[in-house]
Amino acid sequence: MPLPKRFRLNAKNYFLTYPQCSISKEERLAQLQNLSTPVNKKYIKICKESHEDGQPHLHVLIQFEGKYQCTNNRFFDLVSSTRSAHFHPNIQGAKSSSDVKTYIDKDGDTVEWGEFQIDGRSARGGQQSANDTYAKALNSASAEEALQIIKEEQPQHFFLQFHNIVSNANRIFQTPPEPWVPPFQQASFNNVPAIMTQWVSDNVCDAAARPMRPLSLVVEGPSRTGKTLWARSLGPHNYICGHMDLSPKIYSNNAWYNVIDDIPPHYVKHFKEFMGAQRDWQSNCKYGKPIQIKGGIPTIFLCNPGPQSSYKDYLSEEKNRSLNDWVQKNAIYVTIEEAIFTTGSQTSP
């Protein structure tokens, strides 16, 4: 009579199934983490699945740094800490850790430890279908989730086309800029020149009430007079400061107006498009892809007095005479000398 075959499994990825296992996911994870093996564990994922009979089943994926040879079919047994009970799993080698991870993810009640080790194999005989992968990525909730799906199921694409994949994911899942919340109420700005208040009334509004060609506003004044906080408190806007960035992460075509702050006039790309509230124009700012700007909204230009900063000084140069004539028809220029809010109040800007 032949001797019973000894248990032996030599694999890098283990797929365990525990029927009728009532131990919590966290306790199971702790017990599996504490198992002593000659090969380091890299990743553990546990899923609790409730069958029709109401009994919880447990699926586990364990990934090792290299192949681990298991000769004890009781090695992965779990022990209840509240009663005298052992839970013995069915033990298999996972031909495709990606497929196993997808399978045990289906119920969503999971816990994991470590970093998943990607492979390019599929139990269906070959690589994952690219269409299946990208359909799953498109149906995911965020760019990060989509990229993780592609990384796990299409590692070759992810490695060789990383730049394009990341760029496409960010475009597909792009979110509008977070609306800015003013730290002070509009009433705090109680020293605003009447011409600026009237400009707001005439030009800053939603698309339905906005003039066909609104006027822009240039405000020049010393630092710490409240220019920026006032300009940003008027409604939904695009705020551009430091350099011209019209990427979708910064610029929204649904804004009511733009604020261009502390950018020297000779560095303002699309000067006329912004100041003239022009419509439907294109931008290809440095290092960015060409984008379509809806336009038709006014712009507030904020600057300090002095060389290289003042729009007034820039436009008064002889070489800019014709540009200055154009600006007079498309913008209102205001110079302030003092704070546009009342000082001394704790709620003042």
UniProtKB/Swiss-Prot annotation:
Q: Where is this region: Binding to RBR1?
A: 143-153
Cofactor binding summary note: Divalent metal cations, possibly Mg(2+) or Mn(2+).
Q: According to the UniProt record, which cysteines are disulfide-bonded? A: none
Cell compartments where the protein resides: Host nucleus
Pfam families found in the cross-reference section: Gemini_AL1, Gemini_AL1_M
Q: Which UniProt keywords apply?
A: ATP-binding, Covalent protein-DNA linkage, DNA replication, DNA-binding, Endonuclease, Helicase, Host nucleus, Host-virus interaction, Hydrolase, Metal-binding, Multifunctional enzyme, Nuclease, Nucleotide-binding, Nucleotidyltransferase, Transferase
Q: Does the keyword Hydrolase apply?
A: yes
Task: State if RNA-binding is listed as a keyword.
Answer: no
The free-text domain remark for this protein reads: There are 3 rolling circle replication (RCR) motifs. RCR-2 is probably involved in metal coordination. RCR-3 is required for phosphodiester bond cleavage for initiation of RCR.
Q: What is this protein called?
A: Replication-associated protein
Which species is this UniProt entry from? Answer: Pepper huasteco yellow vein virus
Q: What is the lineage of its organism?
A: Viruses, Monodnaviria, Shotokuvirae, Cressdnaviricota, Repensiviricetes
